[in-house]
Regions:
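A short beta-loop-alpha structural element at the N-terminal edge
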Residues: 2-15
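Helix-loop element at the rim of GNAT/NAT acetyltransferase active sites that forms part
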Residues: 17-34
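Acetyl-CoA-dependent GNAT
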Residues: 32-90, 101-102, 107, 161-162, ...
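Glycine-rich acetyl-CoA-binding "A-motif" of GNAT/NAT acetyltransferases
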Residues: 61-64, 126, 152
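Conserved catalytic-core motifs of GNAT/GCN5-like acyltransferases
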Residues: 67-70, 117-120, 132, 137-154, ...
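Conserved beta-strand-loop-alpha-helix junction that forms the acyl-donor binding cleft
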Residues: 92, 118-128
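Conserved acetyl-CoA-binding loop-helix of GNAT-fold acetyltransferases
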Residues: 93-106, 129-133
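Conserved GNAT acetyl-CoA-binding A-motif
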Residues: 108-120
Length: 199
């Protein structure tokens, strides 16, 4: 299994296919209409510019993906990022979710983000277990905040201080000043050298 940066043209269709059941079959996503491959490609392109979007791949098959996105629009929130990970149910329990997060967090740190937040529609023991295994701590619950499939759902929030922020002094620099060149740094994974590989 390799972790690499997502390519909007190459990966959008597979990513949209993985995501669609999470939209249509339950409360994991609060979207009510699954995005098309073209819409997903646009999301990948936008978030690659400001955050990071990674995929886990085995051969030519996408197992899952993870990304960071803005937490809130107002300026004081700019050092926080929401993170999400989705793994094809056929490939659960292979470690893809954790591997994706372990590769994602350093990329977000490089871009200046100091805090990762994850919102989880409850109950979801598997997602809670993954996030807590990755070091996230629960910080609160929004009660009955989402209505989907005929019922109200709670959303729990977990947060993780990104390691670089714990040892560095506070900076007033905008996260937008981080170099976009970092996302293309060559790293090896699974014995394969590629400018898009992470590991």
């Amino acid at each position: 299994m390799d972790i690499r940066h997502a390519n909007s043209a190459r990966d959008a269709e597979a990513i949209a296919a993985i995501y669609a059941p999470f939209v249509t079959n339950g409360p994991v996503s609060f979207e009510d209409v699954a995005p098309t491959a073209a819409e997903m490609a646009g999301r990948i392109e936008r978030l690659t510019e400001t955050h990071a979007w990674l995929v886990a791949e085995d051969g030519d098959e996408i197992l899952g993906y993870a990304y960071g996105c803005p937490h809130r629009e107002r300026a004081a929130y700019q050092w926080a990022t929401e993170v999400s990970v989705y793994v094809d149910p056929r490939h659960h329990r292979r470690g893809a979710g954790r591997a994706l997060y372990e590769a994602l967090f350093p990329r977000l740190e490089e871009r200046g983000y100091r805090l990762a937040l994850a919102g989880i529609a409850l109950p979801n023991d598997a997602s809670v277990g993954l996030h807590e295994a990755c070091g996230f701590e629960p910080v609160g619950v929004y009660r009955r905040i989402g209505f989907k499939h005929g019922k109200w759902w709670d959303v729990g929030w977990w947060q993780l201080e990104l390691p670089a922020s714990q040892s560095s002094s506070s900076s007033n620099a905008s996260v937008g000043q981080a170099s976009t060149a970092r996302r293309a740094s060559p790293i090896r994974s699974g014995g394969t050298s590629d400018s898009s590989m992470i590991g």
